[in-house]
Amino acid sequence: MAAQQTKGLPMTARWDPEKLQREIDELQSLESRPFLSRAGGYLKRTGPGLLQSAMTLGAGSAAASVVAGASFGYTLLWVQPIAMFLGVCMFAALGNVVLTTGERPYPAFGRELHKSVAFLWALGTIVASVIWHFPQYGLAAGAARDLAELGGIPTADPAGGFTAAGYLVSFGIGAGILGLNIFTTWNYGSHARGIKLYEWFLRSIIGLVILSFAVVVIKTGVNWSELSRGFFGFQLPGTSGAATVVLGAIGAAVGINMTFLYPYSLLAKGWGAHHKALARWDLAMSMFLPFVLVTSLVIIAMANTVYDPTAQRTLHDIKPVDAAQALVPVMGSSLGRII
């Protein structure tokens, strides 16, 4: 039944039944191992949660973390973990249903609720994917222009706007990213090696971001009492704009397009009822942990380098590219901006 319902998904035709059964046997044996051994075994098999983590670590979360750290210091450290915890709970429930039934969620929504609900869900996914892509391209263009300035190419027009080189760099990086995304999307799932390379590429990029800001945090020091209050104090500053920053961070943590992608990525990996424990570990280690680490380190780094406790205002005009300033004291102006 499950195999019939997942027929036609890009990776389904490439399942190796014997390999899948070996994986199930290995997962069952992992359940009786010590915690660290079990965690290592699950970590090697993660995947769908990693896609969600990479998908949500975009311009929205970056901007919210930069503004939170630069405007309020450690105070709003609690927001991102709470936001992602809510998302993980939703994905865990969604994954449990999908792995139990092995059924595609779109027809299930149409049957159990109404076809119009399923259609609106799919439509919302498409609209959200388009809308949320605009800030990603804006962030990439801003970073590309910053690197061009570093290389001596003027991109900002003193009279306002950008120079011809600035527009060329902006549209060039946009076209490059679009081409890479199209190539990756059409080829993802074409063979097992490509999938593993793609997932390890995501791990490497996320790991680089974590390492970069971890170095800044270590070098600039941590106020442990403020850190504790930031994570567990659940304070909301009375400053104008604080509530907007909190709501923006929560809204950027998980999108409706992720709720559509996640169940299909589970089915396309060949996961079923025997993979429920792996799916929970995947959400915890590949989605929750990287997201919280990255956003928390960005907030702490901005709090240590940019935050001015005497300002008492929300820095709405600060941009994610400005997070590079947090790396300057440790890595220098040039390397900090490149990283």
Q: Whereabouts are the PLM-identified features?
A:
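Transmembrane-helix boundary/entry motifs in multi-pass membrane transporters
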Residues: 35-39, 73, 100-130, 147-150, ...
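Transmembrane alpha-helical segments of multi-pass small-molecule transport proteins
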Residues: 122, 149-189, 204-212
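Transmembrane helix-boundary motif of multi-pass solute transporters/channels
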Residues: 45-86, 90-93, 102-103, 138, ...
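Selective recognition of specific alpha-helical transmembrane segments in multi-pass small-molecule
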Residues: 80-90, 94, 215, 251-254, ...
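Membrane-interface "cap" regions at the ends of multi-pass membrane proteins
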Residues: 2-63, 207, 245, 271-277, ...
